[in-house]
Regions:
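Second-shell loop/turn segments in exported
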Residues: 53-58, 101-103, 134-138, 203-205, ...
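A short helix-breaking turn/cap at a secondary-structure junction
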Residues: 31-112, 119, 288-295
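Glycine-rich, small-residue loops and helix-cap segments
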Residues: 9, 72, 76-79, 108, ...
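Acyltransferase
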Residues: 105-127, 149-156, 163-170, 205-222
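Loop/turn elements at helix/coil->beta-strand transitions in domains of secreted/extracellular proteins
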Residues: 7-11, 61, 94-95, 118-122, ...
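Short helix-loop capping/hinge segments that flank enzyme active sites or metal/cofactor-binding pockets
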Residues: 94, 142-211, 250, 256-262
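Short glycine/serine-rich loop segments
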Residues: 1-69, 242-251, 258-263
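Sec-exported extracytoplasmic/periplasmic mature domains
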Residues: 4-6, 70-77, 117-121, 141, ...
Length: 296
């Protein structure tokens, strides 16, 4: 994301488990797209959780994001459906978004909501009760404990085949200042995670996804919603667990110059909607500014 923000690259491909595309994209004032889980191949991604991990584009604008999404193998034809001309005429008129009440304390978010309303969007405030994803860390720990050795076996050269989390920790300790400046407590948590049968683990993951999807779909039904608008990666965990796609677009800068992103969330497999919403918002705001020291 930093390389894209500084104009060193046209685009980048990030990977997200729960916020790792949305957060850096927001923090660097670029457009980040986390697709419906399973949209793009996960082959080659260093895993945290094969259940949640996904690749996704990080770009300077929505059109570039759509082009890269096509190149990555999006099953929907973003360019044909939302081509250059369509992006220019993208509209938010009549689109019904849920907004989280507490997020309105952020003045940039409050202004973004005004911009959406001026563009014809309908905003419905919802309370801040969000799904309790009990055991989310357990999911990540148990998945990585299994997935990292599989990654080394399938992607690494002969030197590293057979490696696992314990072996990575051992290697890190050889140069702790460079390799582990923040310690290895998360890795240790993975090693300490109790074993769980495949059947029980599958049931556990499916239950978590059901909880997250129930939260979103109940709100959609109750308020006749098209989607949700959030900030940065504030609701990334719930969206990830539900397999919901999300796209963050530059929302402006606070008084210290810190970028923020307006994050659109759509129902499962409704990724195409994100491009239309994001293009419409980008068109009326154009918040991205090239960092001062990187202007040519």
């Amino acid at each position: 994301g930093v390389s894209v923000a500084a104009n060193f690259a046209v685009a980048a491909i990030g990977s997200e488990t729960s916020g790792s595309i949305l957060s850096p994209s927001s923090q660097n004032s670029v457009v980040g797209y986390k697709p419906t889980t399973g949209t793009f191949s996960g082959v080659g991604i260093v895993p945290i959780s094969s259940y949640l991990d996904t690749a996704g584009p990080m770009t300077k604008n929505v059109m570039d994001n759509a082009i890269l999404a096509q190149a990555l193998g999006a099953p929907y034809d973003v360019i044909d459906q939302y081509g250059i001309n369509s992006f220019e005429t993208a509209s938010l008129k009549g689109v019904r978004f849920a907004v989280w009440t507490s997020f309105k304390e952020n003045p940039l978010y409050a202004q973004a909501l005004l911009d959406l309303e001026k563009s014809g969007a309908v905003l419905i405030e919802i309370d801040d009760t969000r799904p309790q994803l009990n055991g989310f860390l357990k999911l990540l720990n148990a998945d990585m404990k299994k997935d990292l050795p599989a990654y080394f076996a399938g992607q690494a050269n002969a030197t590293y085949r057979g490696w696992d989390v314990a072996k990575v920790m051992e290697w890190n300790r050889k140069d702790s200042l460079k390799a582990m400046p923040y310690g290895q407590s998360l890795f240790q948590g993975i090693i300490d995670e109790p074993a769980i049968s495949d059947a029980d683990f599958r049931e556990f993951k499916e239950a978590m996804t059901a909880t997250a999807q129930e939260y979103f779909y109940n709100l959609i039904k109750e308020h006749d919603l098209n989607g949700f608008v959030s900030i940065n990666n504030y609701t990334a965990g719930a969206a990830a667990a539900a397999f919901f796609p999300a796209m963050t677009v530059p929302m402006g800068y606070d008084d210290k110059g810190q970028p923020y992103g307006l994050t659109f969330i759509a129902p499962n497999e409704a990724d195409q909607l994100l491009f239309n919403w994001a293009a419409a918002y980008e068109k009326i705001t154009k918040h991205r500014v090239l960092p001062e020291n990187y202007k040519n």
